[in-house]
A protein has these predicted regions:
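A short, basic N-terminal segment
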Residues: 1-37, 42, 240
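Short glycine-/polar-rich loops that comprise or flank the Walker A/P-loop
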Residues: 61-65, 185-187, 212-215
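Conserved Walker B catalytic segment
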Residues: 126-195, 204
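Helix-loop-helix "sensor" segment of P-loop NTPases
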Residues: 201-252
């Protein structure tokens, strides 16, 4: 039973998502046309909810969207594990398919695969590799190779991307990612994160590898008028009432 007008502290969807029509259309177009995208804004402005919405809208028989959050990754190795697991899992519809893709495309790495109770959704990959070896390029090429094999396009969305700035030898790692990803034709990337200053530095500093990597989108505040409509609508949906005037006062008090 839903009796609370609003959802707090988590990504939202459906009726709990408001506005962002322009940004939704832009991201959807970029996804469908293979345009790399960088999404930048302060924390709690709805980046994750927006990207997840576009992921759902973009998914089709000819376009697969992969989503992963690397907030818990503290090293290159952990990044590669998370990246490979997400790409294999979210581009395959059958257990046999993703295991075959792992066998074919990661053969030089000999991945260790652990299955849970639900193999299609509950599995993890541990990669026996040296991050400095050329073999890691096989992991970064996974989206492109799978896309070409299936005759589709793939978009990889990476949340909390600013975490890579904390890795040891981060600049060398960034160079490796950029050098591989920028040459891919059937795979594109949407990179975003919650620490605006780090994201700005990664993508706006000329001396860093990801400078001018893609279409940079700065997420603006949602307008007061849209917030008022949303607040009033959510109150009505849960059997409550609030006037537009009072909703407007709330918006102004918290600076939207």
């Amino acid at each position: 039973m839903e009796n609370k007008p609003f959802v707090f502290g988590v990504a939202t969807s459906g009726d709990n998502f408001t506005d962002r029509k322009k940004e939704t259309a832009l991201l959807l177009s970029n996804f469908r046309h293979g345009v790399n995208t960088v999404l930048i804004s302060p924390r709690r402005w709805g980046k994750t909810s927006l990207v997840r919405k576009v992921c759902r809208l973009a998914q089709s028989d000819t376009l697969k969207v992969v989503y992963l959050d690397i907030f818990s990754c503290r090293s290159e190795r952990e990044f590669y594990d998370a990246f490979a697991s997400a790409v294999l899992k979210q581009t395959s519809s059958k257990l046999e398919e993703w295991m075959e893709n792992a066998r074919v495309f990661l053969s030089r790495i000999s991945p260790k695969i652990s299955l849970g109770a639900e193999p299609m959704t509950d599995f993890s990959i541990s990669l026996e590799l040296n991050p400095k070896a050329d073999d890691v390029d096989d992991i970064l090429q996974l989206p492109e190779k799978i896309a070409q094999k299936k005759g589709i396009d793939v978009v990889v969305c990476i949340d909390e991307f600013q975490q890579i700035a904390e890795f040891k030898d981060s600049k060398a790692f960034q160079k490796r990612l950029r050098s591989v990803w920028q040459l891919q034709k059937s795979a594109s990337y949407c990179l975003f994160g919650s620490k605006k200053h780090l994201m700005n530095e990664l993508f706006e500093k000329k001396s860093l590898p990801f400078y001018k990597f893609g279409d940079t989108v700065y997420l603006p505040k949602i307008g007061t008028e849209d917030w008022v409509d949303y607040i009033c609508g959510r109150f009505e949906a849960t059997g409550k009432h609030i006037s537009a005037e009072l909703a407007g006062k709330i918006c102004r008090a918290v600076d939207n």
